[in-house]
Curated annotation (Swiss-Prot):
This is Topoisomerase I damage affected protein 2. Coiled coil: none annotated. It is found in: Cytoplasm; Cell projection. GO terms for cellular component: cell projection; cytoplasm. It comes from Saccharomyces cerevisiae (strain VIN 13) (Baker's yeast). Belongs to the TDA2 family. It comes from the Eukaryota. Keywords: Cell projection, Cytoplasm. Its main location: cytoplasm. Signal peptide: none annotated.
């Protein structure tokens, strides 16, 4: 899997771009290496989102995180048939118990 960050505002991110790419790649690799997960039957994108959000929370719980995975399935794509499917899964995470106030 190739991971790229395009047109994002990674300069505002709690993680540097390179570290974020590494975090996502490590999460994906751990899914592939897990023998108990059947990648052909389970929703890999949801599992990946969960892993990425867990790692981001470990990095810092001061932020709100939104993770989105878009999957393009081209199994039915050939010269005679232009069928494909596109799926997008989204997950979010934040620490609801932490409230930040500015006292003036």
């Amino acid at each position: 899997m190739q991971i790229e960050i395009k047109d994002g505002r990674s300069d505002n991110s709690p993680l540097p771009e390179r570290k974020l790419v590494t975090l996502i790649q490590e999460s994906y690799d751990s899914l592939k290496d897990d023998n108990e997960i059947n990648l052909s039957t389970e929703s890999t994108s949801n599992l990946l989102i969960k892993l990425v959000l867990e790692k981001l929370e470990k990095h810092s719980s001061l932020y709100k995180y939104i993770a989105s995975v878009t999957t393009l399935n081209i199994e039915g794509l050939n010269e005679e048939n232009a069928n494909f499917s596109l799926k997008n899964d989204i997950g979010a995470s934040w620490e609801s118990k932490k409230r930040w106030y500015i006292q003036l």
